[in-house]
Amino acid sequence: MRHRILTLLLGLAVLVTAGCGFHLRGTTQVPAELKKLQITSSDPYGPLARSVRQQLRLNNVTILEDGSADVPVLKLIDSSENKDTVSVFQDGKAAERQLTLNVNAQVIMPDGSVYPLRSRVDRSFFDNPLEALAKDAENEIINQEMREQAARRLVRQLLTVHNAEKQKAREKQVGQQAAQAQ
């Protein structure tokens, strides 16, 4: 009896999550018009550009290397990393730092429309002066995680580009209908 109830509850949980549109974390429904992209960056082989490419590939986006006029372009404009001291030890050395990564990008559509994208990721980092090697390794891991999170946020923001394009198409259609009515 207990096995049947457990099976029923498990089956009900699966149906509820499947029925509400639940998707596993890490996948974004990238719009069809953005399934093929070209990426430009001042540092095309840098860690941020690699993270963005990886996230796009994970979301089944084809990245085109050659420039084509009919393909949207994701342009990574710049990124900045800041370290602010949040707390200090009694001797005045930094105990905790706030790490901030700001990324500015834009999507340039084939018709020339430009949609800005921004991502900001904040993390705290405990600075232990007694373990210098471990501190450096941990700092690099945190920076990589921040770049990956910023890349995921940029990919999610592609949905806003899709919605803006749909809104622009609706406005164009309404304008054409108004012109025909006159």
Swiss-Prot record:
Q: Where in the cell is it found?
A: Cell outer membrane
Q: What is this protein called?
A: LPS-assembly lipoprotein LptE
Q: What does this protein do?
A: Together with LptD, is involved in the assembly of lipopolysaccharide (LPS) at the surface of the outer membrane. Required for the proper assembly of LptD. Binds LPS and may serve as the LPS recognition site at the outer membrane.
GO cellular component labels? cell outer membrane; transporter complex
Q: For the lipid attachment S-diacylglycerol cysteine, which residues are annotated?
A: 20
The organism named in the record is: Photorhabdus laumondii subsp. laumondii (strain DSM 15139 / CIP 105565 / TT01)
Looking up PANTHER family in the UniProt record yields:
LPS-ASSEMBLY LIPOPROTEIN LPTE
Locate the lipid attachment (N-palmitoyl cysteine): 20
Residues in the signal sequence: 1-19
Question: What lineage does UniProt assign to this protein's organism?
Answer: Bacteria, Pseudomonadati, Pseudomonadota, Gammaproteobacteria, Enterobacterales
